[in-house]
UniProtKB/Swiss-Prot annotation:
Xenovulene A is a natural product exhibiting little structural resemblance with classical benzodiazepines yet is able to displace high-affinity ligand binding to the benzodiazepine site of the gamma-aminobutyrate A (GABAA) receptor and could be potentially used as an anti-depressant with reduced addictive properties. Induction: Expression is significantly up-regulated under xenovulene A producing condition. InterPro entries: FAD-bd, FAD/NAD-bd_sf, FAD_aromatic-hydroxylase. The lineage of its organism: Eukaryota, Fungi, Dikarya, Ascomycota, Pezizomycotina. FAD-dependent monooxygenase; part of the gene cluster that mediates the biosynthesis of xenovulene A, an unusual meroterpenoid that has potent inhibitory effects on the human gamma-aminobutyrate A (GABAA) benzodiazepine receptor. The first step of xenovulene A biosynthesis is the biosynthesis of 3-methylorcinaldehyde performed by the non-reducing polyketide synthase aspks1. The salicylate hydroxylase asL1 then catalyzes the oxidative dearomatization of 3-methylorcinaldehyde to yield a dearomatized hydroxycyclohexadione. It is found in: Membrane. This is FAD-dependent monooxygenase asL6. Pathway: Secondary metabolite biosynthesis; terpenoid biosynthesis. Its cofactor is FAD. Belongs to the aromatic-ring hydroxylase family. One of its GO terms (biological process) is terpenoid biosynthetic process. One of its GO terms (cellular component) is membrane. FAD binds at residues 10-13, 34-35, 108, 290, 312. The keyword Secreted does not apply.
Length: 423
C-alpha cells in the first residue's frame, strides 16, 4: 500500500522529515507545499546540538553541513565600553553540557538547502528501499481540513483540493495547520503560544573593519533588561540580534509594516553605548529585519486524527533554549521512524510518536532560570557580569559540562532498523 502524505512547510522540519521518510521500506507518495514562492532565503544562524549532529551524520550530510558551517569560536560578554568580561569557547556537538555556541553553526537557508537537495536525490535513488514519489510545490498552502475515517481532505490556497492518508504540519512556530485545528474556537487567539516575556529582533549588516577576521559571538546586556548581540564569524556580514521585554504591541507585530516594526526598536537600540548608534543606522537601512515575541509552542497532543505536527509547529522550544534546530531534527526522525515501524497502521504510529518523543520535548523546552529580575537595574547587570567573569576565569563552565553530562543523556535516541541509512 502506498501511503499518501502531505507535508506543509519546506523548512528544517519539513525537509528533514522527507529525508527520513525516503529511507523507509514502505512506499510513500509525498507532496510538500510551501507558502513562500521558493525556499526562504532569510533566517538567522542555527546550530546543531546533542542529537543534531548524529542525525545529520545518519543522513550522510554532516560534511555538507561542515562545508557551510560558520567558524564561531567563542561567546563573549562585553560592557558598554566594549571591554570583554567573560569568554566561553565553542562546544563540540553532542558532547557534554551544551554551550551557547557549538561546533556546527550554519545559516538557516544553507541548512534547508542541504536538506532540500538531499531529499530530491535520495527519493530518486533506485538502490534505496523505495524509491519514493516526492514533489515540492511552492506558493501554495492548506486553508481547510476535513477529516474522514482514514483520510484528510485538504483545500488549498489556489482552490484545488485532494485527499491524503496523513497530513504533517511542519509550518513553523506560527503554523497555519495548528491554528486551523488546535484553536479551541475561532477568534480566541493562538492559545498554544506561551510567551517568554522577551521580544527578539534580527537583521544582517555590513562587517566593520575590526570584525573582518572576528570569529566571536559578542553579547552586551544593560538594565531594562535589554540585550544586543553581534555574531561576527560569517565572512560576508555581521548578524545583529536584539532583545527587549515583550509588550502587547509586540504580539500584534505581524499586522504592522516593516518600517513601523523597526521604529519600535529605535529607542532601545540607540540607548546602547556599545555599538548602539552603528546598529541603529544599519537597522534603518535594513530590508531583512525580522522581529518576533519569543514564545514556545505547547499542545497537549501533537496529532488530531490523521493530522500531526512536527518541529516548531508542534513543540517550538524558543530561541532561549538554543535547541530549536535539534528538536526539529529529532522530531522528524522519530515521526518517520514510527511510521516506518508501524507500516499501514498510521494511528498506532502517531500514538507511539507521542509516547517516544514527549519526554525529550519536555526536557528540551525547559528554559534555564536566569533570574531576569536582576537585569532590571545597572547594579544587577554589574553583579551578573562579575559572576560571569569568575565563571569564565575559573573555567567553572567546564565543570558544569562534566556535572550535567549525565543529565543531558537520560533520553536515548531510538534506533529504527526500518529506516535504511548508508554505512
Amino acid at each position: 500500500m502506498t501511503v499518501k502524505i502531505l507535508v506543509s512547510g519546506a523548512g528544517v522540519a519539513g525537509t528533514a522529515l522527507v529525508n527520513f521518510l525516503c529511507r523507509s521500506k514502505h512506499e510513500y507518495d509525498i507532496t510538500v507545499v510551501e507558502r513562500a514562492p521558493a525556499l526562504r532565503a532569510a533566517g538567522s544562524q542555527l546550530d546543531l546540538k546533542s542529537f543534531g549532529a548524529p542525525l545529520m551524520r545518519k543522513l550522510g550530510l554532516i560534511e555538507k553541513v561542515r562545508e557551510k558551517s560558520i567558524h564561531e569560536t567563542a561567546f563573549t560578554f562585553v560592557d558598554s565600553k566594549g571591554r570583554e568580561w567573560a569568554r566561553f569557547p565553542v562546544n563540540e556537538a553532542g558532547k557534554g553540557y551544551e554551550g551557547i555556541t557549538s561546533e556546527f553553526e550554519i545559516m538557516r537557508a544553507d541548512l534547508v538547502a542541504v536538506l532540500y537537495e538531499a531529499s530530491k536525490e535520495v527519493s530518486a535513488n533506485p538502490f534505496m528501499k523505495g524509491p519514493q514519489k516526492l514533489r515540492y510545490v511552492f506558493g501554495k498552502h492548506g486553508v481547510h481540513f476535513t477529516q474522514g475515517n482514514s483520510k484528510v481532505n485538504v483545500v488549498f490556497s489556489d482552490g484545488s483540493s485532494d485527499d491524503y492518508d496523513l497530513v504533517v504540519g511542519a509550518d513553523g512556530q506560527y503554523s497555519m495547520t495548528r491554528r486551523l485545528l488546535w484553536e479551541p474556537e475561532k477568534g480566541s487567539g493562538d492559545t498554544t503560544l506561551k510567551y517568554t516575556g522577551v521580544t527578539a529582533g534580527f537583521f544582517q549588516m555590513p562587517k566593520s573593519e575590526d570584525e573582518a577576521d572576528s570569529t566571536l559571538f559578542k553579547n552586551c546586556l544593560q538594565a531594562g533588561p535589554r540585550g544586543l548581540c553581534l555574531r561576527c564569524a560569517h565572512k560576508d556580514f555581521t548578524q545583529a540580534m536584539l532583545g527587549i521585554p515583550t509588550t502587547d504591541e509586540h504580539k500584534q507585530v505581524f499586522k504592522k509594516p516593516l518600517e513601523q516594526q523597526k521604529q519600535m526598536w529605535e529607542e532601545s537600540v540607540g540607548s546602547f553605548k556599545w555599538q548602539g548608534q552603528r546598529v541603529l543606522a544599519e537597522l534603518r537601512k535594513s530590508d531583512d529585519f525580522y522581529m518576533t515575541p519569543v514564545a514556545q509552542v505547547k499542545v497537549d497532543r501533537w496529532s488530531k486524527g490523521r493530522v500531526v505536527l512536527v518541529g516548531d509547529a508542534g513543540y517550538c522550544p524558543s530561541v532561549m533554549t538554543g535547541r530549536g534546530t535539534t528538536v526539529s531534527l529529532v522530531g522528524a526522525y522519530v515521526l518517520a521512524g514510527e511510521l516506518a515501524k508501524h507500516g499501514d497502521n498510521i494511528d498506532a504510529a502517531l500514538e507511539s510518536y507521542e509516547k517516544v518523543l514527549r519526554p525529550f520535548i519536555t526536557t528540551a523546552q525547559e528554559i534555564p532560570s536566569m533570574g531576569m529580575g536582576m537585569f532590571q537595574s545597572k547594579f544587577g547587570v554589574g553583579v551578573f557580569y562579575v559572576l560571569l567573569a569568575i565563571i569564565s576565569k575559573l573555567k567553572i563552565d567546564r565543570l558544569l559540562q562534566a556535572l550535567m553530562k549525565e543529565e543531558k543523556e537520560t533520553w536515548e535516541l531510538p534506533e529504527y532498523p526500518e529506516l535504511e541509512f548508508e554505512a
